């Protein structure tokens, strides 16, 4: 996670802009997070508060160059979403989704080995770095103040 602390900016892609994903994405934006794109298979071509929505992670990455991927997709599709982000070159992935079948995550674990990827989750609230105005996940921004400490949670 140190690469996040040392970067000038952190550009976030959100995959899964359904009801919950949209609500939490707005909370990230309100905190100051730079959300550069969204991904939703049936909302491609639309936008979420001015943020373009694409039909695939690959297209979103090509057009918006995110550093971080945030996943809110339903459990049956979450492992494929993680792999799609890995294949698209995203190196820091936060998966909020809970209830992913164990065999799906074993597949992800085997796939991620040897790759330059950091996966936080699944079933986690994400992370929050107040001094960088960076909130990736569902941790409430109202519980923190500026300072030298960030919050990382790997389990819900």
Task: Give, region by region, the residue ranges found by the protein language model.
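General beta-strand structural signal in soluble alpha/beta enzymes
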Residues: 37-40, 93-95, 118-129, 153
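Generic hydrophobic/aromatic pocket-lining and core-packing "Φ" positions
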Residues: 25, 57, 82-86
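Glycine-rich adenosine-cofactor-binding loop
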Residues: 10-23, 150-156
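Short, ordered loop/turn segments at secondary-structure junctions
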Residues: 17, 39-44, 76, 97-101, ...
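NAD(P)-binding Rossmann-fold cofactor-contacting core
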Residues: 22, 30-48, 122
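Conserved anion/nucleotide-ligand pocket segment
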Residues: 129-156
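Rossmann-fold NAD(P)-binding glycine/threonine-rich loop
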Residues: 98-120
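Rossmann-fold NAD(P) dinucleotide-binding segment
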Residues: 62-63, 68, 72-99
């Amino acid at each position: 996670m140190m690469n996040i602390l040392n970067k000038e900016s952190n550009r976030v892609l959100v995959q899964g802009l359904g009801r919950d994903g949209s609500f939490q994405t707005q909370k990230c934006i309100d905190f100051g997070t730079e959300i550069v794109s969204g991904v939703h298979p049936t909302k491609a071509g639309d936008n979420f508060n001015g943020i373009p929505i694409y039909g695939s992670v690959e297209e979103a990455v090509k057009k918006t160059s995110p550093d971080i991927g945030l996943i809110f997709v339903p459990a049956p599709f979450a492992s494929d979403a993680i792999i799609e982000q890995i294949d698209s070159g995203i190196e820091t992935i936060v998966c909020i989704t809970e209830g992913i079948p164990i065999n799906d995550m074993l597949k992800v674990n085997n796939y991620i080995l040897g790759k330059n990827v950091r996966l936080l989750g699944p079933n986690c609230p994400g992370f929050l770095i107040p001094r960088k105005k960076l909130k990736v996940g569902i941790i409430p921004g109202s519980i923190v103040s500026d300072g030298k400490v960030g919050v990382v949670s790997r389990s819900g």
